Structures are given as structure tokens and as C-alpha cells.
Amino acid sequence: MTRFLFLVRHGDASPHDGPLSPAGQEQARLTGRRLKDVPFSAVYHGPLPRAAQTAKLIAASLPGVPVTASELAGDYIPSNPDPEDLPRRFADFVASFPAAERAAGAARAEAARERFIRPDDGAPDSYELVVTHNFLLGWLVSQALDAPPWRWLGLNQMNCAVTVIACQPGLPAALITFNDASHLPPELRWTGFPATLRPASI
């Protein structure tokens, strides 16, 4: 009765808010090949083109699995933390978004947490894939680990890296893997990731 939530950040896009770049398309295809044997019951993706296109390319390796757009998997600020709780750089970043946008994002993120980070009381084990964006992915990981609500800040994912969270009745959620890009060749890793956080020779 374990519920496995697979989270994938969209592929590299060019421009950032546009469709996938050629590299992003290849990242998505390779991610689909990696996940082809996982018995998914559903694939969800954010409504923006880069997430929708990534999901479509992944789903090409998952015949018969329904693919659905979801606003919950979109690109938004997932919490509205007190600036006093944040490092200054994070506080300035959050403050750059309008208050109404932050409030709406926090409500949507809570709905996403309730929808995706929950145990499955049925049997057998279940598997779902969510193709989403950096902020929400970090938020879901932070919530699975009972971290402070603002701790999605600084949790960065590479494009098309795979994160897996397992939920079981009566137990805290378990982070199985985070930001795993081992299915991508070196030249397709680390896109979308802050250069200042990339370790040398990895």
C-alpha cells in the first residue's frame, strides 16, 4: 500500500518561458526511456508549454497511461513566508512577487500537497508521475520532510532529473531519490541548475 510519487522537472526550454530546446527534448525522451517500466496509473503536468511538451515526450514511452494537465502542477510561488524567517537573499526574492500572487500560490501549493503527498489506503502499490517546475518540486520535497514552509527555496533540480517520494499509511513520507539525473549524459545534465551550486568534476 505504498504510493510512489515520481516528480520530474521539465526539460530545458529556450527561451526560459518558451517550448523545449533541442537539448530539453532529448532530456525528456531519455527520461521516458528511464521510466518506461514503471507501472504508472497517471501522468500529470503543469499547463505551461515546457511542462506539457516534456510530459508528452516522456509519455511516448508509457503507452496507455493517461496524461492530464493540472494547474496544481504549474509554475508558481508555493508559500508566502514571513520575511523575518528567511535569509536576506531569499526574502528579497520572494518580495519581488506581488502579494496577491504569493497568496494564491500558497493556496494552490497546499492543494497540491494534499493531492500528491498522501498515502494510498488501497492495494496494491500505486505510481503517479508529475511533470512540474522547480519551485513546486522543491515545495513538495520540503513538505514530505516536514521542513519549514519556506524551505523550498534553495532546493534546486536539474531539468528532467527524477525525484521519488513514497507515502505509506501511518508513516511520514520518505524521500527515495532526489534530483537524480543518472539517465542523462554529462552534456545534458545540470541545465537549469545554479552554476554556483554545482560541485566540481561531477
Sequence positions of predicted segments:
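Acidic, low-complexity terminal tails and accessory targeting/binding regions
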Residues: 1, 64, 75-85, 124-126, ...
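Loop-to-helix element that buttresses phosphate recognition and phosphoryl-transfer chemistry
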Residues: 3-58, 105-110
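Generic beta-sheet signal
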Residues: 5, 124-135
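Conserved beta-strand termini and adjacent loop/short-helix elements that scaffold enzyme active sites
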Residues: 8, 70-72, 178
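Active-site metal-binding loops of divalent metal-dependent hydrolases
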Residues: 11, 134, 181
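Phosphate-coordination/substrate-recognition cap region in phosphate-metabolizing enzymes
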Residues: 29-100, 201-202
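Active-site signature of alpha/beta-hydrolase-fold catalytic machinery across serine-
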Residues: 57, 139, 143
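Internal catalytic-core helix/loop-beta-alpha segment
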Residues: 96-126
